[in-house]
Protein backbone atom coordinates (compact mmCIF):
# COMPACT_ATOMS: atom_id res chain seq x y z
CA UNK A 1 0.00 0.00 0.00
CA UNK A 2 1.19 3.52 -0.80
CA UNK A 3 -0.17 6.45 1.20
CA UNK A 4 0.33 10.22 1.02
CA UNK A 5 -0.69 13.06 3.30
CA UNK A 6 -1.12 16.06 1.01
CA UNK A 7 -0.81 19.11 3.23
CA UNK A 8 1.37 17.99 6.14
CA UNK A 9 0.85 21.06 8.30
CA UNK A 10 -0.30 21.13 11.92
CA UNK A 11 -2.78 18.25 11.64
CA UNK A 12 -1.11 16.32 8.84
CA UNK A 13 2.24 16.20 10.62
CA UNK A 14 0.63 14.57 13.65
CA UNK A 15 -1.34 12.04 11.59
CA UNK A 16 1.83 11.28 9.65
CA UNK A 17 3.77 10.72 12.86
CA UNK A 18 1.20 8.23 14.13
CA UNK A 19 1.04 6.35 10.82
CA UNK A 20 4.83 6.26 10.48
CA UNK A 21 5.15 5.01 14.06
CA UNK A 22 2.83 2.15 13.05
CA UNK A 23 5.09 1.33 10.07
CA UNK A 24 2.63 2.57 7.43
CA UNK A 25 4.51 3.59 4.22
CA UNK A 26 3.24 7.17 4.20
CA UNK A 27 4.69 10.29 2.56
CA UNK A 28 4.21 13.63 4.33
CA UNK A 29 3.88 16.22 1.55
CA UNK A 30 4.05 19.99 1.96
CA UNK A 31 5.24 23.08 0.07
CA UNK A 32 7.02 24.22 3.26
CA UNK A 33 10.63 23.33 2.41
CA UNK A 34 11.96 24.21 5.86
CA UNK A 35 9.39 21.87 7.40
CA UNK A 36 10.35 19.08 4.99
CA UNK A 37 14.06 19.49 5.74
CA UNK A 38 13.47 19.55 9.50
CA UNK A 39 11.39 16.37 9.36
CA UNK A 40 14.05 14.67 7.25
CA UNK A 41 16.76 15.66 9.73
CA UNK A 42 14.95 15.15 13.05
CA UNK A 43 11.71 13.37 12.25
CA UNK A 44 8.18 14.63 12.88
CA UNK A 45 8.06 15.98 16.43
CA UNK A 46 4.75 16.07 18.29
CA UNK A 47 4.47 18.13 21.48
CA UNK A 48 1.55 19.16 23.67
CA UNK A 49 -0.80 16.57 25.09
CA UNK A 50 1.29 13.80 23.45
CA UNK A 51 5.08 13.71 23.09
CA UNK A 52 6.85 11.82 20.30
CA UNK A 53 9.48 12.18 17.61
CA UNK A 54 9.17 9.80 14.67
CA UNK A 55 11.30 9.34 11.52
CA UNK A 56 9.12 10.12 8.49
CA UNK A 57 9.26 10.28 4.70
CA UNK A 58 8.83 14.02 4.09
CA UNK A 59 8.59 15.45 0.57
CA UNK A 60 7.66 18.49 -1.46
CA UNK A 61 4.87 18.04 -4.05
CA UNK A 62 7.32 17.75 -6.96
CA UNK A 63 8.83 14.70 -5.25
CA UNK A 64 5.59 12.73 -5.12
CA UNK A 65 5.77 9.41 -6.96
CA UNK A 66 2.42 7.64 -7.12
CA UNK A 67 0.41 5.67 -7.80
CA UNK A 68 -1.17 6.15 -4.37
CA UNK A 69 -3.75 3.85 -2.84
CA UNK A 70 -4.86 6.50 -0.35
CA UNK A 71 -4.30 10.27 -0.34
CA UNK A 72 -5.31 12.13 2.80
CA UNK A 73 -6.20 15.63 1.59
CA UNK A 74 -5.28 18.03 4.41
CA UNK A 75 -4.47 21.21 2.49
CA UNK A 76 -6.35 24.48 2.89
CA UNK A 77 -9.23 24.81 0.44
CA UNK A 78 -7.87 27.94 -1.19
CA UNK A 79 -6.99 26.01 -4.37
CA UNK A 80 -8.68 22.64 -3.99
CA UNK A 81 -9.44 22.29 -7.68
CA UNK A 82 -5.84 22.86 -8.75
CA UNK A 83 -4.57 20.51 -6.05
CA UNK A 84 -6.99 17.78 -7.11
CA UNK A 85 -6.08 18.05 -10.79
CA UNK A 86 -2.44 17.66 -9.72
CA UNK A 87 -3.21 14.59 -7.59
CA UNK A 88 -5.68 12.77 -9.84
CA UNK A 89 -3.11 11.29 -12.28
CA UNK A 90 -1.12 9.94 -9.32
CA UNK A 91 -3.99 7.89 -7.89
CA UNK A 92 -3.90 4.12 -8.27
CA UNK A 93 -6.72 2.59 -10.30
CA UNK A 94 -8.70 2.05 -7.10
CA UNK A 95 -7.02 4.91 -5.22
CA UNK A 96 -9.10 7.26 -3.08
CA UNK A 97 -8.90 10.82 -1.80
CA UNK A 98 -9.92 11.20 1.84
CA UNK A 99 -11.10 14.74 2.63
CA UNK A 100 -9.76 15.65 6.06
CA UNK A 101 -10.63 19.30 5.50
CA UNK A 102 -12.96 21.93 6.91
CA UNK A 103 -16.23 23.03 5.35
CA UNK A 104 -18.03 20.95 2.73
CA UNK A 105 -15.31 19.90 0.25
CA UNK A 106 -16.70 16.57 -0.98
CA UNK A 107 -18.76 17.78 -4.00
CA UNK A 108 -15.76 19.50 -5.59
CA UNK A 109 -13.44 16.58 -4.85
CA UNK A 110 -15.90 14.14 -6.43
CA UNK A 111 -16.27 16.37 -9.50
CA UNK A 112 -12.53 16.05 -10.20
CA UNK A 113 -11.53 12.53 -9.10
CA UNK A 114 -14.97 10.87 -9.20
CA UNK A 115 -17.49 9.97 -6.51
CA UNK A 116 -16.20 6.39 -6.30
CA UNK A 117 -12.78 7.76 -5.30
CA UNK A 118 -13.96 10.31 -2.73
CA UNK A 119 -14.29 9.51 0.97
CA UNK A 120 -15.36 12.23 3.37
CA UNK A 121 -13.83 12.41 6.84
CA UNK A 122 -14.15 14.78 9.79
CA UNK A 123 -11.36 15.45 12.29
CA UNK A 124 -12.39 15.87 15.94
CA UNK A 125 -9.08 17.10 17.37
CA UNK A 126 -6.88 20.12 16.98
CA UNK A 127 -3.24 21.07 16.56
CA UNK A 128 -0.98 24.10 16.25
CA UNK A 129 2.07 24.33 13.97
CA UNK A 130 5.05 25.26 16.17
CA UNK A 131 7.76 25.58 13.54
CA UNK A 132 9.73 23.42 11.12
CA UNK A 133 9.33 19.78 12.09
CA UNK A 134 7.15 20.45 15.13
CA UNK A 135 3.38 20.33 15.67
CA UNK A 136 1.51 20.64 18.97
CA UNK A 137 -1.47 18.37 19.70
CA UNK A 138 -3.86 20.62 21.62
CA UNK A 139 -6.75 18.21 22.30
CA UNK A 140 -6.86 15.81 25.24
CA UNK A 141 -5.61 12.33 24.19
CA UNK A 142 -8.91 10.71 25.19
CA UNK A 143 -10.90 13.11 23.01
CA UNK A 144 -9.36 12.30 19.62
CA UNK A 145 -11.51 10.77 16.88
CA UNK A 146 -12.28 10.70 13.16
CA UNK A 147 -15.71 10.51 11.53
CA UNK A 148 -15.33 8.46 8.33
CA UNK A 149 -18.06 8.66 5.73
CA UNK A 150 -19.61 5.46 4.43
CA UNK A 151 -20.05 6.74 0.88
CA UNK A 152 -22.42 4.61 -1.25
CA UNK A 153 -20.31 4.98 -4.41
CA UNK A 154 -17.07 3.81 -2.75
CA UNK A 155 -16.27 0.07 -2.58
CA UNK A 156 -16.55 -1.21 0.98
CA UNK A 157 -13.04 -2.62 1.06
CA UNK A 158 -11.56 0.84 0.36
CA UNK A 159 -13.52 2.39 3.23
CA UNK A 160 -12.30 -0.41 5.51
CA UNK A 161 -8.74 0.18 4.33
CA UNK A 162 -8.95 3.86 5.24
CA UNK A 163 -10.62 3.06 8.57
CA UNK A 164 -7.79 0.70 9.45
CA UNK A 165 -5.22 3.39 8.66
CA UNK A 166 -6.90 6.12 10.70
CA UNK A 167 -7.52 3.80 13.65
CA UNK A 168 -3.75 3.61 14.12
CA UNK A 169 -4.06 7.10 15.59
CA UNK A 170 -7.44 7.16 17.36
CA UNK A 171 -11.02 5.80 17.27
CA UNK A 172 -12.88 6.02 13.96
CA UNK A 173 -16.65 6.52 13.90
CA UNK A 174 -18.27 5.17 10.72
CA UNK A 175 -20.78 7.76 9.49
CA UNK A 176 -23.61 6.62 7.21
CA UNK A 177 -25.22 10.06 7.44
CA UNK A 178 -22.01 11.78 6.48
CA UNK A 179 -23.54 15.16 5.63
CA UNK A 180 -24.96 15.20 9.16
CA UNK A 181 -21.50 14.43 10.57
CA UNK A 182 -19.87 17.01 8.32
CA UNK A 183 -22.36 19.66 9.43
CA UNK A 184 -21.74 18.83 13.10
CA UNK A 185 -18.08 19.67 12.57
CA UNK A 186 -19.01 22.71 10.47
CA UNK A 187 -21.13 24.27 13.21
CA UNK A 188 -18.31 23.76 15.72
CA UNK A 189 -15.83 25.34 13.30
CA UNK A 190 -18.13 28.19 12.32
CA UNK A 191 -18.90 28.96 15.95
CA UNK A 192 -15.74 28.35 17.92
CA UNK A 193 -13.20 28.86 15.10
CA UNK A 194 -15.00 31.83 13.59
CA UNK A 195 -15.59 33.80 16.79
CA UNK A 196 -12.24 32.94 18.42
CA UNK A 197 -10.43 33.98 15.23
CA UNK A 198 -11.88 37.48 15.14
CA UNK A 199 -11.13 37.76 18.88
CA UNK A 200 -7.61 36.35 18.61
CA UNK A 201 -8.04 33.79 21.38
CA UNK A 202 -8.52 30.07 22.11
CA UNK A 203 -11.81 28.19 21.89
CA UNK A 204 -11.97 28.09 25.69
CA UNK A 205 -11.42 31.83 26.06
CA UNK A 206 -14.17 32.59 23.54
CA UNK A 207 -16.56 30.31 25.43
CA UNK A 208 -15.63 31.67 28.87
CA UNK A 209 -16.21 35.35 28.06
CA UNK A 210 -19.95 35.94 28.45
CA UNK A 211 -20.15 38.62 25.77
CA UNK A 212 -18.39 36.58 23.11
CA UNK A 213 -20.38 33.51 24.15
CA UNK A 214 -23.57 35.36 23.14
CA UNK A 215 -22.27 35.71 19.59
CA UNK A 216 -20.81 32.23 19.56
CA UNK A 217 -24.24 30.89 20.50
CA UNK A 218 -25.91 32.90 17.75
CA UNK A 219 -23.44 31.72 15.10
CA UNK A 220 -24.15 28.11 16.12
CA UNK A 221 -27.90 28.75 16.14
CA UNK A 222 -27.72 30.01 12.55
CA UNK A 223 -25.90 26.79 11.58
CA UNK A 224 -28.60 24.70 13.23
CA UNK A 225 -31.37 26.65 11.49
CA UNK A 226 -29.66 26.28 8.11
CA UNK A 227 -29.27 22.53 8.65
CA UNK A 228 -32.98 22.20 9.44
CA UNK A 229 -33.95 24.15 6.34
CA UNK A 230 -31.64 21.97 4.21
CA UNK A 231 -33.10 18.80 5.77
CA UNK A 232 -29.73 17.81 7.25
CA UNK A 233 -29.95 15.65 10.37
CA UNK A 234 -26.97 16.63 12.49
CA UNK A 235 -25.04 13.69 13.94
CA UNK A 236 -23.51 13.52 17.44
CA UNK A 237 -19.80 14.28 17.83
CA UNK A 238 -17.96 11.76 20.02
CA UNK A 239 -21.30 10.72 21.46
CA UNK A 240 -22.41 14.29 22.22
CA UNK A 241 -25.63 15.40 20.52
CA UNK A 242 -24.61 19.00 19.87
CA UNK A 243 -27.90 19.85 18.18
CA UNK A 244 -29.92 18.67 21.16
CA UNK A 245 -27.64 20.42 23.64
CA UNK A 246 -27.19 23.75 21.89
CA UNK A 247 -30.38 24.33 19.88
CA UNK A 248 -33.24 26.29 21.44
CA UNK A 249 -36.69 27.62 20.64
CA UNK A 250 -37.57 29.38 23.91
CA UNK A 251 -35.77 31.49 26.55
CA UNK A 252 -35.32 28.61 29.00
CA UNK A 253 -33.63 26.35 26.43
CA UNK A 254 -31.58 29.32 25.26
CA UNK A 255 -30.28 29.85 28.81
CA UNK A 256 -29.42 26.16 29.14
CA UNK A 257 -27.64 26.20 25.78
CA UNK A 258 -25.67 29.26 26.86
CA UNK A 259 -24.56 27.56 30.08
CA UNK A 260 -23.52 24.38 28.28
CA UNK A 261 -21.24 25.98 25.69
CA UNK A 262 -18.07 26.02 27.86
CA UNK A 263 -18.70 22.42 28.92
CA UNK A 264 -19.21 21.30 25.32
CA UNK A 265 -15.73 22.50 24.35
CA UNK A 266 -13.94 21.65 27.62
CA UNK A 267 -11.60 18.98 26.20
CA UNK A 268 -10.66 21.24 23.28
CA UNK A 269 -10.49 24.52 25.22
CA UNK A 270 -6.82 25.06 24.36
CA UNK A 271 -7.37 24.98 20.59
CA UNK A 272 -6.35 27.94 18.48
CA UNK A 273 -8.31 28.04 15.24
CA UNK A 274 -6.38 27.25 12.07
CA UNK A 275 -7.82 30.49 10.66
CA UNK A 276 -6.22 32.45 13.50
CA UNK A 277 -2.93 30.64 12.96
CA UNK A 278 -3.10 31.63 9.28
CA UNK A 279 -3.73 35.27 10.14
CA UNK A 280 -0.84 35.26 12.61
CA UNK A 281 1.43 34.13 9.78
CA UNK A 282 0.05 36.63 7.27
CA UNK A 283 -1.78 34.00 5.23
CA UNK A 284 -5.26 33.90 3.73
CA UNK A 285 -7.82 31.81 5.63
CA UNK A 286 -10.53 29.27 4.84
CA UNK A 287 -13.33 31.46 6.21
CA UNK A 288 -15.24 31.21 2.91
CA UNK A 289 -15.18 27.40 3.22
CA UNK A 290 -16.27 27.46 6.87
CA UNK A 291 -18.61 30.31 7.86
CA UNK A 292 -19.04 31.12 4.18
CA UNK A 293 -20.50 27.64 3.56
CA UNK A 294 -23.17 28.35 6.17
CA UNK A 295 -23.94 31.71 4.55
CA UNK A 296 -24.27 30.22 1.06
CA UNK A 297 -26.44 27.31 2.16
CA UNK A 298 -28.56 29.69 4.22
CA UNK A 299 -29.10 31.92 1.19
CA UNK A 300 -30.14 28.88 -0.88
CA UNK A 301 -32.80 27.99 1.69
CA UNK A 302 -33.95 31.47 2.69
CA UNK A 303 -32.35 31.44 6.17
CA UNK A 304 -30.68 34.71 7.25
CA UNK A 305 -27.15 34.30 8.64
CA UNK A 306 -26.14 37.78 9.87
CA UNK A 307 -23.67 36.55 12.50
CA UNK A 308 -21.86 34.22 10.11
CA UNK A 309 -21.90 37.03 7.53
CA UNK A 310 -20.19 39.26 10.09
CA UNK A 311 -17.50 36.67 10.84
CA UNK A 312 -16.73 36.37 7.11
CA UNK A 313 -16.53 40.15 6.72
CA UNK A 314 -14.30 40.65 9.77
CA UNK A 315 -11.88 37.87 8.84
CA UNK A 316 -11.48 39.26 5.32
CA UNK A 317 -10.86 42.73 6.75
CA UNK A 318 -8.13 41.30 8.98
CA UNK A 319 -6.62 39.49 5.97
CA UNK A 320 -6.47 42.81 4.10
CA UNK A 321 -4.85 44.59 7.04
CA UNK A 322 -7.88 46.82 7.60
CA UNK A 323 -8.30 45.66 11.21
CA UNK A 324 -6.63 43.34 13.68
CA UNK A 325 -8.01 40.51 15.76
CA UNK A 326 -9.10 41.26 19.32
CA UNK A 327 -12.05 41.47 21.70
CA UNK A 328 -12.90 44.91 20.27
CA UNK A 329 -14.32 43.14 17.21
CA UNK A 330 -17.30 42.00 19.27
CA UNK A 331 -18.60 45.55 18.76
CA UNK A 332 -19.13 44.70 15.08
CA UNK A 333 -21.87 42.16 15.84
CA UNK A 334 -25.26 43.83 15.81
CA UNK A 335 -27.67 43.34 18.71
Language-model region placement:
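Active-site-adjacent beta-strand anchor residues
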Residues: 5, 29, 73, 99-100, ...
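Rossmann-like NAD(P)(H) cofactor-binding subdomain of soluble oxidoreductases
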Residues: 51-136
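NAD(P)-dependent Rossmann-like dehydrogenase/reductase catalytic/cofactor-binding core
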Residues: 217-335
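NAD(P)+-binding Rossmann beta1-loop-alpha1 motif at the extreme N-terminus of oxidoreductases
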Residues: 1-51
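Internal alpha-helical scaffold of NAD(P)-dependent oxidoreductase catalytic cores
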Residues: 89-90, 112-117, 134-241
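Nucleotide donor/acceptor-binding cores
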Residues: 1, 69, 144-146
Amino acid sequence: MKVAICGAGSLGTILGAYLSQADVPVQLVTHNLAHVEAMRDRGATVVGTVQMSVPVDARTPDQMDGPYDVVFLMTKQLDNEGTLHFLEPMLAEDGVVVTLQNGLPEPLVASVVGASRTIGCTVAWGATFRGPGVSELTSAPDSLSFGLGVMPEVPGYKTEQVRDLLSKMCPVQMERNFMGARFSKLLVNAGFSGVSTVMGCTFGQAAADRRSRVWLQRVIKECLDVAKAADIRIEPIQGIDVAKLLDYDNPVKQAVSFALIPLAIKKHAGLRASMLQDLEHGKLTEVDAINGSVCRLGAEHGVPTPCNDTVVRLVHEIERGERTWGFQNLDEFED
